[in-house]
């Protein structure tokens, strides 16, 4: 059947906050402050870990990588969103949309696999403490991070390629503030069955597999902790895992809510506001949860602050 009066989509128009036109300046101020706070907080965490040699161990190495990924993650989306909030023309080229989706997926998927790596690190620290420095040497840590990034890159490349090989001849108005999977699929012609396949792939590869690895790690961790002779030892061992468990719960909870819930339950504006939780708020709080609960990190930060003040 021939297409009539259909043109290929060359650019995408963002309509994420179009129903909140009167609040866009306020949203700009709020999101800008959150973005700057996210950058500042994560930069402080990275700097503290780099400057204090006592923190040059695998757990803090992975925390620094996590903070770095959070900075990149927000940089992919937030600056463009801030510009659009103050602009009349809220557009992105079709190629730019594809690049944004790939970058977002790459960092998000890598983040999921990195959380699995951090779970494995906790497993080695608690279940094999005497061999921890050998099993989690610098080369091993670098290899695990590289593997997490490789998995993220592969998943992002496959999904982005599949999505943008679809025919885009319909509307170019995207009811979102960045090129996320579900909103972009709605622009594609004949996407219904394909969208289900893509979302299933995303959930299986990025949510189920890393989460399963984390659960396996914590089954072994819990088994080892229960064998500790003293209650104090059990509490101390488990306290090192609490921050990681909180981040895992927040990350997978947000991702599951966004990608597994029925799409028809919320309006486009509600979808956009919900997405803010994992594009701005989560990257702000994740590293803070990990660092502020940790006495070693707080001690190192205070030491660096005192040293800096003494030099002024």
Swiss-Prot record:
The keyword DNA-binding does not apply. The chain crosses the membrane at residues 26-46, 55-75, 100-120, 140-160, 198-217, 238-258, 272-292. Residues 1-25, 76-99, 161-197, 259-271 are extracellular. GO terms for biological process: detection of chemical stimulus involved in sensory perception of smell. One of its GO terms (molecular function) is olfactory receptor activity. Glycans are attached at residues 5, 265. It is a multi-pass membrane protein. Pfam families: 7tm_4 (PF13853). Its main location: membrane. InterPro entries: GPCR_Rhodpsn (IPR000276), GPCR_Rhodpsn_7TM (IPR017452), Olfact_rcpt (IPR000725). Residues 47-54, 121-139, 218-237, 293-312 are cytoplasmic. Gene3D superfamilies: Rhodopsin 7-helix transmembrane proteins. This is Olfactory receptor 10K2. The lineage of its organism: Eukaryota, Metazoa, Chordata, Craniata, Vertebrata.
């Amino acid at each position: 059947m021939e297409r009539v009066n259909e043109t290929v989509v060359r650019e995408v128009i963002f309509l994420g906050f179009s129903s909140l036109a009167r609040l866009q300046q306020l949203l700009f101020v709020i999101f800008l402050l959150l973005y700057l706070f996210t950058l500042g907080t994560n930069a402080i965490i990275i700097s503290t870990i780099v400057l204090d040699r006592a923190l040059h161990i695998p757990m803090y190495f992975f925390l620094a990588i996590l903070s770095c990924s959070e900075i990149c993650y927000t940089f992919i989306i937030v600056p463009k969103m801030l510009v659009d909030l103050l602009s009349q023309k809220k557009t992105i080229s079709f190629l730019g949309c594809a690049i944004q989706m790939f970058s977002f997926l790459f960092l998000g998927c890598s983040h999921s696999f990195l959380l699995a790596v951090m779970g494995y690190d906790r497993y080695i620290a608690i279940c094999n403490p005497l061999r921890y420095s050998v099993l989690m040497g610098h080369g091993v840590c670098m290899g695990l991070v590289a593997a997490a990034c490789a998995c993220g890159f592969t998943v992002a490349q496959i999904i982005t390629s599949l999505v943008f090989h679809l025919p885009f001849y319909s509307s170019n108005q995207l009811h979102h503030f960045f090129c996320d999977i579900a909103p972009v699929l709605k622009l594609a012609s004949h996407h219904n069955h394909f969208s289900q396949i893509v979302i299933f792939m995303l959930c299986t590869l990025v949510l189920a597999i890393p989460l399963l690895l984390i659960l396996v790690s914590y089954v072994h961790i819990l088994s080892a902790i229960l064998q500790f002779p003293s209650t104090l030892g059990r509490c101390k061992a488990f306290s090192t895992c609490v921050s990681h468990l909180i981040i895992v719960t927040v990350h997978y909870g947000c991702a599951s809510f966004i990608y597994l819930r029925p799409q028809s339950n919320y309006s486009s504006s509600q979808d956009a506001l919900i997405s803010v939780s994992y594009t701005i708020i989560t990257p702000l709080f994740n590293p803070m949860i990990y660092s502020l609960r940790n006495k070693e990190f707080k001690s190192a930060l205070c030491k660096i602050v005192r040293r800096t003040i003494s030099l002024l």
